[in-house]
Amino acid sequence: MNFDQKAVKFLANFYINGGKHWTRGPLSQKPLHPTQPSAAAVLWWDQELETAWDEMWHPKMKRSSSGFRLRIGAPNESTPISTGTLRELWLERRPPILMDLDVPGPAQYEVPNMSLREASPHPQYTIGRKYPVREGGGRRAWQTMWLQSESPFMQKTDFNRETKWPSPAEYTPLSQPAFPAFSFGDRHRSVVKMPESRFRPGMLRARGPCSYTPLLPTSKPSGEKRPSPNTYNILPGYRLQSTRSPAFSMSRSPAFASWVSSSGTPGPAAYYVEDCYNSRFPSSPGVVIQGVRRPKRHDTGPFCTL
C-alpha cells in the first residue's frame, strides 16, 4: 500500500475503535449499533478526525477538499449523511491534496518569445574548447557574434533576400602590397669593394687591394642554356667499360655445386642409430642417440651407456 492508503486505514481504525489508538493486544472491531448515526455524532467524529489529521501534517500541507469537511453548525441544519456504515462513509470521502498550493506551476511562467536573430536562447556555456569567432560575412555566418548581437549599431543581413555580395576589389587593404622577406633558392651576390678596416676573419682576399671574393660562387646568368635530364645518354652505362671482371659475384660458389647435384644423397631417415651396437669395430662411439629405453642400472645410473 502507498502512504495515502495507509493513512485511510489508520483513520478508519481510529473511528472503529471509538477514538482510541491501539496500544497492545489484538485489535477487536466493535460492531456498530447505529446503522445511521445522528448528525451530532457525525459532527463530533468529524471534529476529532480533523484534529488528529492536522497534527500529522505540516502547516503548509493542511489543505483539504470541500467534500472532506462537514459543515459545523446547529444540529437542526441539514447535513448530508450517506446511508451505510461509518467505514463506507469514510472510504467515499476524498483524501487531502498532498501538495503545496503556494508554489507556482509551470503555466505561471512566461517564456520569452525572441527570434534567433535578435537574441540566442541557447545556454551560455559550452563543453569543450571555444574557438575564437571571426567577424565577417558569408552565407554560413549565422553563428557569428556580430549576427547574434543585440546592439542596434550592428548591421544584420538577411541572407534570404540579399543576392548582391561585395567582390574582393571593393575592399581596401590596410597596407600596400610588398614582396615577401624570404625566398627559395640561391641568393645573388656580387663582388663589392670594402675598406681594409672592415675585413672580417673568414673572408678570402683577392689580388686587388680593396676587394674580396665571396664564399658562395656567383650564379650564372639566367640566359645560358643548360641541359635537361632527358638530354643525357644512358646507354653506355649498361655496357662493361673495363676489361677486368669484378671481384665479387652474385651467384653460387662452385664448392657448393654438390649440394644441388642429382646424386643420391641419403636423407636423415636413411640412418639407423641402433646399428652401432652390432658394429664390428672394436669400440663404440662415446655418444649414442638412441630411441629405445635401456634398463636402469644402479652402479652406472640411468643416463649412462657403456
Curated annotation (Swiss-Prot):
Residues 210-230 are annotated as: Disordered. The gene is Stpg3. This is Protein STPG3. It comes from Mus musculus. InterPro entries: SHIPPO-rpt. It comes from the Eukaryota.
